[in-house]
Regions:
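Non-transmembrane, membrane-proximal soluble domains of secreted or membrane proteins
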Residues: 2-31, 51-188
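Active-site-proximal cofactor/substrate-binding loop regions of enzyme domains
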Residues: 36
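Alpha-helical transmembrane segments
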Residues: 40-54
Length: 188
């Protein structure tokens, strides 16, 4: 689809997902967002309550309580349980991102200074470079800073393994396709 994976003006959310993995990442993000929002509101309300109830005006004689075992166990176990509930789907997604058991094709992406080199090792070792177009080279409607002279073409509905590396004499590069839920750094 033309324009798939492009951000829109004033966009505050994720790009449209183009893979099942990205759909799961968006769902996980939504769940964690609401959990964190609820926790933040709870902590804020608890803090406001404690500040009000135990202020110097309301509490002329301060409490001499040194500890409360039940409360201490609760404020240790509840956060641990919340983290476990968040960690389980997170680990499942991390595993899915690195599951290479059913691969249809392999692509090798090599980061160079200001461009990427691509290889199709499974298909006659086809290689090419994708160099970003200058403003003068852009055609009408091509996105600035995203258009290259050669595009990486991938088949639809296939599991593709991308081997990401960097020129040994180069710098760290970031290979990313947000609509597929992929971002990987290439370190020399």
């Amino acid at each position: 689809a033309d324009g798939l994976g492009l951000a829109k003006d004033w966009q505050l959310s994720f790009q449209e997902p183009a893979s099942p993995l990205m759909e799961e990442l968006i769902n996980f993000h939504s769940i964690v967002f609401w959990v964190i929002t609820a926790l933040t509101i709870f902590v804020f309300l608890l803090l406001a309550y404690v500040c009000y109830k135990f202020s110097a005006k309301k509490n002329k004689v301060p409490s001499k309580t040194t500890h409360n075992s039940v409360l201490e166990v609760a404020w240790t176990l509840i956060p641990v349980l919340i983290l476990v509930v968040i960690a389980i789907p997170s680990f499942r997604l991390l595993y899915k991102q690195n599951d290479f058991s059913n691969i249809d094709m392999t692509i090798k992406a090599t980061g160079y200074t200001w461009y990427w080199g691509y290889e199709y090792p499974d298909h006659d070792d086809i290689t090419f470079d994708a160099i970003m177009l200058t403003d003068e080279e852009l055609a009408e409607g091509q996105p600035r800073m995203l258009s290259t002279d050669n595009m990486l073409v991938l088949p639809v509905k296939k599991n593709i393994k991308v081997l990401i590396t960097s020129d040994p004499a180069g710098v760290i590069h970031s290979w990313s396709v947000p609509s597929l839920g992929v971002k990987m750094d290439a370190v020399p």
